[in-house]
Structures are given as C-alpha cells and as structure tokens.
Amino acid sequence: MILTDTNIFIDFWNNPTEDLKNVFIKEDIAVCGVVRAELLHGAISAKDFANITTMLEAFDEFNLEIPDWQILGDNLYNLRKKGISVPFSDAIIATIALKHGIPIWTGDRHFLLIQSVLTGLNIYQTPNRL
C-alpha cells in the first residue's frame, strides 16, 4: 500500500509514462482526504469533477481522526523547531502516512524536508520523482 500524493495523479494524467502505469498496476494505491480535495478542486467542469470522483472510488482512503490532530500539531512543532516550514496539507499527508506505516508516493520535495525530521516517514521512489 502506498499513499499517493496529488502531483502523481496530475503527472499521470498529463503524461502517463510506463513507470507510472506500472506502479498503478502493481501497487495498492491509497489516497487521503487532502489529495481527494486537491484533485476535485482542480476539476474544470462538472463532468471532470464526476470523473475524478469516480476514479477516486477505486482507491483506499486514509484520513485523520480526532486524536491525530494532536500528533499533527506535534509534527509541525518538531519541524518548526528545526527551522522547517512546509505546507499544512503536506504535513497532514505525512502524518497520515506515519500513522498507517505506509510510504508516500510523491514528487514534492517538501516531503524530503519532513523526512529529515520525522525519520520514520518513508517515500516511495520512482524515476524522475524526487
């Protein structure tokens, strides 16, 4: 199982390379609420919105529960103590991945910064993605 970041879906839709196709075929893909919302936010029509919604139904989804918000706050605090500021959405995604012990598939370098402090975070690597 890998938690897939928004940028991977966008890359795949814009340029469906063989390496991306193979991961989508071979791996169990998961999303989280942040990724769902970001993808739906990018819809350009009602049809596009419906297609994205249908596509997302194919994947497992992980989200934060009430106690996890304290953990997210702890993670953000620990990052800030090291002088690292990352987008709030990326911190949520990282916290979800850490909670469930699953790697994040991303092309976003913010996750390397997060990983430098939250060393339990695993990043799923594919060619040309970090």
Where are these regions (language model features)?
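A generic structural signal for short hydrophobic patches within well-formed alpha-helices
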Residues: 9, 36-39, 111-112
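Short, hinge-like loop/turn segments at secondary-structure boundaries
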Residues: 46-50, 79-80, 121-125
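A generic structural signal for well-ordered alpha-helical segments
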Residues: 24, 54-55, 79, 97
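Active-site neighborhoods of divalent-metal-dependent phosphate/nucleic-acid chemistry enzymes
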Residues: 61-109
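Short, well-structured N-terminal submotif of metal-dependent ribonuclease cores
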Residues: 1-31, 40-54
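Acidic, PIN/NYN-like endoribonuclease modules and their adjacent C-terminal/linker elements
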Residues: 1, 16, 98-130
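General small-molecule cofactor/ligand-binding pocket signal
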Residues: 30, 62, 124
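A secondary-structure boundary/capping signal
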Residues: 5-6, 35, 107
